[in-house]
């Protein structure tokens, strides 16, 4: 988690059903650890966000075994080539992931597409949790957040 807490910013990438999970992961890191993080659709990297990649920047890549897997891995290789430290979250085994220079890999259990989003979300929640703990923040009482939001 220090890679994320010490960085100027981080990026979360996903395609298909993993894109909203990437957004949620970035949001949780912002809400709990007060670290700048943004979620982006992996397929849109060449339209701007790729320019934000700096050497050592932490990037979470959600790459479940789905129709977008190969394209997501290609996007991951692009950010690695620009110096990003990639945390890959996938339901493929390390031996099946054909990419070198991945900083960390978290392999979740394989499940059907209805359940897989839950399995991909847990590592992101733990990342935010441990990042907040490392910085000494109260996980149960994030600043400026309420359990319910009402607008009148």
Model regions: which residues?
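A SIS-like phosphosugar-recognition module
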Residues: 1-152
């Amino acid at each position: 988690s220090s890679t994320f807490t010490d960085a100027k910013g981080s990026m979360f990438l996903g395609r298909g059903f993993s894109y909203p999970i990437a957004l949620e992961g970035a949001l949780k890191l912002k809400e709990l650890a007060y670290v700048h993080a943004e979620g982006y659709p992996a397929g849109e990297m060449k339209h701007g966000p790729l320019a934000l990649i700096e050497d050592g920047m932490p990037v979470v890549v959600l790459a479940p075994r789905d129709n977008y897997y190969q394209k997501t891995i290609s996007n991951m290789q692009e950010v690695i080539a620009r110096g990003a430290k990639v945390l890959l979250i996938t339901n493929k085994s390390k031996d099946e992931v054909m990419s070198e220079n991945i900083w960390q890999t978290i392999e979740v259990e394989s499940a059907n597409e209805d359940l897989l989003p839950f399995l991909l979300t847990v590592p992101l929640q733990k990342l935010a949790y441990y990042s907040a703990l490392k910085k000494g923040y109260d996980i149960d009482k994030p600043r400026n957040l309420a359990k319910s939001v009402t607008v009148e």
